[in-house]
Amino acid sequence: MARYLGPKLKLSRREGTDLFLKSGVRAIESKCKIDTAPGQHGARKPRLSDYGSQLREKQKVRRIYGILERQFRNYYKEANRLKGNTGENLLVLLEGRLDNVVYRMGFAATRAEARQLVSHKSIVVNGRVVNIPSYQVSVDDVIAVREKSKKQARIKASLELATQREKPTWLEVDATKMEGVFKRTPERSDLSADINEHLIVELYSK
């Protein structure tokens, strides 16, 4: 499946919630009618079956993190293989992606922008350039903006914007140095309560 390149707000309207696909400079409610489905008439969303709800939740999470279907399924398989709660394991794996960590640290305004920074070799992990967005960050890893990329206006703007967001407690960031440390693995209570990972587990368990 190809990566979606269409209007980002359309995806948020389809899921009925902010997927954080835009920078967040303006509230999403000021940009679109988030509580109505996309389309000319913005029809009300029909009541979903159990399967429909499970599928929608999977699509929502997949779109939040910008993951393709095959990648997402592989993450689920890995989460299921690990000890502990499969749903929580899935979210932890997604949060540990380098592009997500770059976004969480405030070096990028969106995960898509973070993915681009990583792919363009603007990010170093423990002093070495890593250009794989799906790279799994480990505890105590130091993630930083590459020296020659620190002058990029979009990175400076993103760090300024990040001051308006809640700071993740599992990360330690020095905005002046443009670097941060992955202090610990996030717990479920650290992550969004708007995600129902149990529905995803039910979907893939069939």
From Swiss-Prot:
Domain S4 RNA-binding span(s) in chain numbering: 96-156
Keywords assigned: Ribonucleoprotein, Ribosomal protein, RNA-binding, rRNA-binding
Coiled-coil ranges (or none): none
A single GO BP: ribosomal small subunit biogenesis
Superkingdom assignment: Bacteria
Pfam families: Ribosomal_S4, S4
Annotated Gene Ontology cellular component terms: small ribosomal subunit
Record's function text: One of the primary rRNA binding proteins, it binds directly to 16S rRNA where it nucleates assembly of the body of the 30S subunit.
Protein name: Small ribosomal subunit protein uS4
Organism for this UniProt entry: Glaesserella parasuis serovar 5 (strain SH0165) (Haemophilus parasuis)
Biological classification of the source: Bacteria, Pseudomonadati, Pseudomonadota, Gammaproteobacteria, Pasteurellales
